[in-house]
C-alpha cells in the first residue's frame, strides 16, 4: 500500500467524543465508532481510543477508564444517558466530571494518614 493511500485510510477513520452519564458522573471518552445499537433504546460505542504513550506521566482519570472498560469490546449505552456525540478531528483528554458540580473528578490512590500512638 502506498504511503498516500495509508495516510488517506488514517484520515478516513472517524473519531468521536462521546459524553455520557455513568454512576452520577459525566464521562467523556473517545471512540472510532458510534451507531444505533441492535438493542432497542441503546447507542453502541466501540473502538475506544486511549492515550498510548509509554512515558512516566500517567493520567489517573484515563487509566481508571482504561481499566474500567478493558474487557468491553462494545459499550451499549442507554440512549437517555448519552449527553452528546461529537465528530472531532483529534483526540482530547478523557475526563470524568461530577454530575452536579461539573468539576473534574481525579481518582488518586490515597492511603489514609497513619495513626501514631501518643
Predicted regions and their residues:
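Eukaryotic intrinsically disordered, low-complexity regulatory linkers and tails enriched in Ser/Thr/Pro
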Residues: 1-118
Amino acid at each position: 500500500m502506498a504511503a498516500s493511500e495509508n495516510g488517506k485510510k488514517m484520515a478516513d477513520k472517524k473519531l468521536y467524543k462521546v459524553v455520557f452519564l455513568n454512576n452520577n458522573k459525566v464521562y467523556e471518552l473517545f471512540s472510532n465508532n458510534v451507531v444505533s445499537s441492535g438493542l432497542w433504546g441503546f447507542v453502541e460505542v466501540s473502538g475506544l481510543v486511549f492515550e498510548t504513550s509509554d512515558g512516566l506521566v500517567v493520567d489517573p482519570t484515563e487509566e481508571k477508564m482504561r481499566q474500567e472498560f478493558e474487557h468491553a469490546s462494545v459499550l451499549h449505552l442507554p440512549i437517555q444517558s448519552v449527553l452528546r456525540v461529537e465528530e472531532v478531528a483529534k483526540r482530547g483528554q478523557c475526563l470524568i466530571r461530577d454530575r452536579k458540580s461539573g468539576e473534574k473528578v481525579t481518582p488518586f490512590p490515597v492511603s489514609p494518614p497513619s495513626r501514631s500512638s501518643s
